[in-house]
A protein has these predicted regions:
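Short, Lys/Arg-enriched N-terminal segments with co-localized hydrophobic residues
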Residues: 2-14
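N-terminal Rossmann-like or analogous alpha/beta NTP/dinucleotide-binding catalytic cores
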Residues: 16-152, 305
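Conserved nucleotide- and phosphate/pyrophosphate-binding catalytic cores
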Residues: 36, 170, 176-351
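Short helix-capping/linker segments at secondary-structure and domain boundaries
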Residues: 118-122, 156-163, 264-272, 301
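Internal, conserved structured core segments that host functional sites
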Residues: 126-129, 133-178, 182, 204
């Protein structure tokens, strides 16, 4: 997986001295799926050797839409950690931490909220889309302001790069504006981040109607068994105009072919040609896709099993990552308070 840097500044991403830092993460509202993998997670795995990588489990932001389902939160936090480790995130190279355990993030969020307009948040396209998806007629304070919290997540770690799906670009743009505003108002102590969008910014779901989503029941999860993958691919939407096996197909409108293009690139051209000529049927095409997906997921299943059998190790990984993240956040907040002249006990007073 590669990806491209979406330069919101209109220029190239400037490398700075020392190891650059990445901040990325997910809300723990359920298991991660193939859309997460190609949209962001594969880039995190690839870049963790090159960058100082921080991965946030955004449990506070999960409450913006799941506040009434908090009994699942702890299970989901550990579940998403398993997804990271199974996908190849190395805790020796990447710092995995829990958002709610870093109080400095919430302090910085409050400072940012003092100069961030409510109208800017209301007109954020991702906020509007998610509000409609969840049926929010009257947005809560926490939901409306979560992009400000995201800006604090990113900037408190001085992240240069943020691997995201394309629907998160408005949030990165807002984070850049907030950081720029802070640096102009006080002192330039924070870093303006860039968005790194995956090779497949938005993967269509199994139903072919919308992007893959855990809430829409159209996802292949990284934690799915081989039998579950087989079943889901058998039921995936294909070319609706193709009735018989020998009918010429239209791969450009077929969800299964889109997955071949993404996950089976080496055979995609052959499959496209065979589909158009009617020499391969949908059943055989789906079997080849399921085989390819299971081949890709099998190493993840092996890593998952290793960590599932040692829950104490998973807890220690989270605790150590959170300790490290807390230390970095404290250092940044010392600079922030100094810049804002609210470090009241760090200098002499004159009455």
């Amino acid at each position: 997986m590669g990806g491209f840097i979406y330069s919101l500044a209109g220029g190239r991403y400037l490398m700075q001295q020392g190891k650059k830092r990445i901040l990325t993460g997910d809300r723990p509202t359920g298991n991660l799926h193939l859309g997460h993998y190609v949209g962001s997670l594969a880039n995190r795995v690839k870049l963790q050797k090159e960058y100082d990588s921080f991965i946030i489990i955004a449990d506070v932001q999960a409450l913006t839409t799941h506040w009434e389902k908090d009994e699942n939160l702890s299970r989901n936090v550990y579940g998403i950690t398993l997804d990271y480790l199974a996908a190849g995130i190395d805790p020796e190279q990447s710092t995995i931490f829990i958002q709610s355990m870093i109080p400095e993030i919430h302090e910085l969020t409050m400072y940012y909220s003092m100069f961030t307009s409510v109208n800017v948040l209301r007109h954020n396209p991702t906020v509007k889309s998610e509000a409609a998806q969840h049926g929010f007629q009257d947005m809560t304070y926490g939901f409306l302001g979560y992009p400000v919290s995201q800006a604090a997540d990113i900037s408190i770690f001085k992240a240069h790069l943020v691997p995201v799906g394309d629907d998160q670009i408005p949030h990165i743009e807002l984070a850049r504006k907030i950081v720029r505003r802070f640096n102009d108002l006080y002192r330039p102590v924070l870093v303006e981040p860039e968005a790194l969008v995956g090779d497949v910014p938005r993967l269509v779901g199994l139903d072919g109607k919308a992007k893959m989503s855990k809430s829409l029941n159209n996802a292949v999860f990284l934690s799915d068994s081989s039998e579950q993958v087989d079943q889901k691919i058998r039921n995936a939407v294909t070319d609706p105009a193709r009735i018989r096996k020998t009918d010429p197909g239209h791969p450009e409108i077929c969800t299964v072919f889109e997955y071949h293009r993404v996950f089976n690139a080496g055979e995609a051209a052959e499959i496209e040609s065979d589909c158009r000529s009617g020499s391969i049927g949908c059943v055989a095409c789906k079997k080849r896709l399921a085989h390819q997906l299971n081949s890709m997921l099998e190493p993840m299943r092996e890593r998952r099993g290793k960590y599932q059998n040692n829950p104490k190790q998973v807890k220690e990984i989270l605790m150590e990552g959170t300790r490290k993240a807390h230390s970095v956040a404290r250092e940044t907040m010392v600079e922030v308070r100094q810049a804002m002249n609210i470090n009241y006990f760090d200098h002499e007073i004159h009455l």
